[in-house]
UniProtKB/Swiss-Prot annotation:
This is Zinc finger protein 853. Residues 135-144 have a biased composition (Basic and acidic residues). A zinc finger (C2H2-type) spans 485-507, 513-535, 541-563, 569-591, 597-620. The keyword Metal-binding applies. One of its GO terms (biological process) is regulation of transcription by RNA polymerase II. GO terms for molecular function: DNA-binding transcription factor activity, RNA polymerase II-specific; RNA polymerase II cis-regulatory region sequence-specific DNA binding; zinc ion binding. Pfam families: zf-C2H2. InterPro entries: Zinc_finger, Znf_C2H2_sf, Znf_C2H2_type. Residues 29-144, 638-659 are annotated as: Disordered. PROSITE patterns: ZINC_FINGER_C2H2_1, ZINC_FINGER_C2H2_2. SUPFAM superfamilies: beta-beta-alpha zinc fingers.
Length: 659
């Protein structure tokens, strides 16, 4: 058995017991770092210590020089097989072992081992010392040869547990390192995962923020769109309200205009009624006066019938010229004086009546104006509810074709009774009023005709008169058509020279025909005749529906439209229709804004005649009576009369102008 002491340093001490069953041999080996022999002793048998001490120097001197050749083959092979692995282990252990662990091993090896020596000494006997010495000699050589190998083996055996421990430690350290590395890797992985999670969370937060921003932007856009839509709806509502307000205002204006027109018409009707009443009164008075005059004239005519010659009848082909023939009478001066007195009385009575009528008219007009103002205030206070009805704009308006048929004025002849044989007409007798068919002009209307019992009226209608033309007159008319006369001012052509002369009076302003009652002048005699009917109260044109009478045929035509409902005059702007052209002209001023009536005192302009009259009466203290031809003293007498007279003369002219 080998006893292995704990190694302390590179110098190793080994003890080896070799012997047979009968003998024991103790061999101490010591290996130093420098290769010198150690103080170990070989004990075998009962030899003394001195022999051992003597042999030791020899062994020491001889042992290093001898090679280890005589070693057994088995031990050398084992040593050689174990050397490479042991060397590698030693090198690894030496590299891995720290220096503080090597120093105590070296110290343990250098310590003496007295315990082993004390155990070997009791076993030595005297008989065995020689054999032991021989064996020792033999074995010393072998021991010297095996000494380094044994040392190596001993070292290897000593180092194996340490190596195992160190390997275990290393393994543990490696495992710890691996565990640490694994933990670190896990920590790193966790950190990376955390970082990834943090990054993902940040990305998610960013995406959420972006989504929130997009949602906010979308909400803002939606809000803006809603606000814009609300604004558009509000604008549309405002526009609709404005349109409704404008339509309401327009309708209110139209209603006001219609009301004003109705009020004006009412005023005009009331004024016309008043005028008619006044005219009726005047006519009654005039009839009474005429009856008195007729009685006087009949008496005078009865006295003079015997003195007058029979009247001469004109030929058909010759034109009749009526002239006044002077008559000499003895009582002419007396008759003239009586006439003058009667005329003065009549004028005074007329003036008084006219003043009274003017006062009455002014009072009635003031009352009517007050009533109108009250009605307007009431209408303004009342709420006007308007109902809008859809109108088809694409509907075609019906075309109204008007066929104007000229109304032929009838010629009325008042035959003046004349004396039987004297040939002189009675002064003061009513003059004959002649109204010719269209195209004919009465040059002179005064003619001495035979006396009759009562004044007769001879009516010559237009178509019958024109159809009953003589061949000579028809020839003259044809020649006039072939040679028409043309006006040098406006270029208008006429078939007769008399028509041209009458037309030229409109350019020159001549008014040769004057009224004997009021002194008003006219350019045409027919206009004077129609004007004189105002004074005489004559109304030859009767309505076939209501038996109402009129002094002019145009007035009869206009009146008959109230029964038939005909409204031939249509407004081109709004389509409203009227039965009278003057109403259409007055209505069109609301569209055009025309103000034709100018105040001569202040220059203010007005749209309607009623407005300027009210203005003059309220501000300037002036007034005029309608239909009587009375004007202010500062204005000329023929300011408004000619236009009306000319309109009355040409019945179809206003209709043509309106169309």
């Amino acid at each position: 058995m080998l006893h292995q002491p704990t190694p302390g340093n590179r110098g190793l001490t080994a003890r080896m017991e070799v012997g047979p069953a009968t003998e024991t041999f103790v061999l101490e080996l010591q290996c130093l770092e420098d290769g010198g022999p150690g103080p170990d002793t070989l004990s075998g048998g009962s030899g003394g210590s001195e022999s051992q001490e003597e042999e030791e120097p020899q062994e020491r001197n001889s042992s290093p020089q001898r090679p280890a050749v005589s070693a057994p083959v088995g031990a050398s092979e084992i040593a050689e097989e174990t050397r490479p692995g042991q060397r590698e282990l030693q090198l690894q252990q030496l590299e891995q072992q720290p220096e503080p662990q090597q120093q105590p091993q070296h110290e343990q090896l250098q310590q003496p081992q007295p315990h082993l020596e004390l155990q070997q000494q009791p076993q030595q006997d005297g008989q065995q010392q020689l054999s032991q010495l021989q064996q020792e000699k033999h074995q010393s050589v072998h021991h010297q040869e095996l000494k380094p190998e044994l040392q190596l083996m001993h070292q290897q055996q000593q180092l194996q547990p340490q190596q195992v421990q160190e390997q275990q430690r290393l393994q543990q350290q490696q495992e710890q390192l691996q565990t640490q590395q694994a933990q670190e890797q896990q920590v790193l992985q966790q950190q990376e995962q955390l970082q990834q999670q943090v990054q993902e969370q940040q990305l998610l937060q960013q995406q959420q923020e972006q989504l929130q921003q997009q949602q906010l932007l979308q909400q803002q856009e939606q809000l803006q769109q809603q606000q814009f839509q609300q604004q558009q709806e509000q604008l549309q509502q405002q526009q609709q309200l404005l349109l409704l307000q404008q339509q309401g205002q327009l309708q209110q204006q139209l209603l006001q205009q219609q009301q004003a027109q109705l009020q004006q018409q009412l005023l005009e009707q009331q004024q016309a009624q008043l005028q008619q009443q006044l005219l009726l009164q005047q006519q009654e008075q005039l009839q009474q006066q005429q009856q008195q005059q007729l009685l006087q004239q009949q008496q005078e005519q009865l006295q003079q019938q015997q003195l007058q010659p029979p009247p001469l009848e004109p030929e058909e082909e010759e034109e009749v010229e009526l002239e006044l023939m002077p008559v000499d009478l003895g009582s002419e001066q007396e008759l003239e004086q009586q006439r003058q007195e009667l005329e003065r009385q009549q004028e005074l009575e007329r003036q008084q009546e006219q003043r009274q009528l003017q006062l009455k008219l002014q009072e009635e007009l003031q009352q009517l104006e007050q009533q109108l103002e009250q009605q307007q205030q009431q209408l303004e206070q009342q709420e006007v509810q308007l109902e809008l009805t859809p109108v088809e704009l694409g509907a075609q308006q019906q075309e109204v074709q008007l066929e104007l048929t000229p109304v032929q004025p009838e010629l009325q002849l008042e035959l003046v009774p004349a004396a039987g044989g004297g040939g002189a007409a009675v002064p003061g007798a009513p003059a004959a009023v002649v109204v010719a068919p269209p195209g004919y002009v009465v040059v002179q209307e005064l003619m001495v005709l035979p006396a009759v019992a009562a004044p007769a009226v001879v009516a010559i209608p237009g178509p019958a008169g024109s159809a009953a033309l003589t061949p000579a007159r028809q020839r003259r008319r044809r020649r006039a058509r072939d040679r028409p006369t043309i006006c040098g001012e406006c270029g208008k052509g006429f078939s007769r020279s008399t028509d041209l002369v009458r037309h030229q009076a409109t350019h020159t302003g001549e008014r040769p025909h004057r009224c004997g009652e009021c002194g008003k002048g006219f350019s045409q005699h027919s206009n004077l005749v129609t004007h004189q009917r105002i004074h005489t109260g004559e109304k030859p044109y009767a309505c076939s529906y209501c038996a109402k009478r009129f002094s002019e045929s145009s007035a009869l035509v206009q009146h008959q439209r109230t029964h038939t409902g005909e409204r031939p005059y249509a407004c081109g702007d709004c389509g409203k229709r009227f039965s009278v052209s003057s109403n259409l002209l007055r209505h069109r001023r609301t569209h055009s804004g025309e103000r034709p009536y100018v105040c001569e005192d202040c220059g203010e302009r007005f749209r309607h005649k009623v407005q300027i009259r009210r203005h003059e009466r309220q501000l300037h203290g002036a007034g005029r009576s309608r239909g009587l031809g009375l004007l202010r003293a500062s204005r000329p007498a023929a300011l408004g009369g000619p236009a009306r007279a000319e309109q009355a003369a040409t019945a179809t002219a206003p209709a043509d102008k309106a169309l």
